[in-house]
Amino acid sequence: MIDRYINNKINAIWNDQNRFDTWKLIQEKYVETLEELKIAEAGIAKKIRKAEVSKEEVYKQEKVTNHDLASFVDILQKKVGEGSNWVHYGLTSSDIVDSANSLLIIQSIEIAQELILDLLKELKLKAIKNKDTKIIGRTHGVYAEETFLGNIFGNWYLEIKRSLDRVERAKVSIAYGKLSGPVGNHTVVTEEMEKITLEKLGLKPEIFASQIAVSYTHLRAHETVG
């Protein structure tokens, strides 16, 4: 994208470093759940939280593994040290990547919502200010009858407001993740472990999943906001 059209806040959300930090957050909350359920020994989640994994480290390791998530996990485990076997325990790459993408998309949508709200405020002000400003109305591209400029802004306001409602529904529809393992059947990670972890992240578990989460929800969000 051309630089001048980039929203800096949204761009920062999708920066690789923030993406890796989000992966780490999911790993932390997952291990925290394992600790609460007395599956993993206490203190590992805290070590994950304190560990810093830079994007440069992931890039370097990826030249060896040819896999970004595997590279990230390798580095995180080394930094955690004792107890690192619980990092990514029973999970598959898409458990982390798909769940993280849901979080990142939600954050992006929230930025878009802020911008839309600003636009609505401006349209409302212009509708009120120009409620008595007369203009020539058109039908079929030709002059028709006299109307008011405020009415034009009011119509735009309603259309944008309806779009904002659709964006909110898209945000709700995408608030799902998966932590159900390589084929989505909870062989190692139980439904309880998945549910507790995702709740900490503000997500719900997918009812059905395979290796990946259902992609339709992500597609719908992109379609609505785009």
Regions found by a protein language model. Give the residues of each.
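A structural signal for small-residue-enriched, beta-sheet-centric alpha/beta enzyme cores
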Residues: I207-A209
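Single conserved hydrophobic/aromatic residue that forms the stacking wall/gate
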Residues: H218-G226
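A helix-coil-helix interface module used to build multimeric assemblies
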Residues: M1-H186, T190-L198, P205
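Cationic, amphipathic, low-complexity alpha-helical segments enriched
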Residues: A213-V214
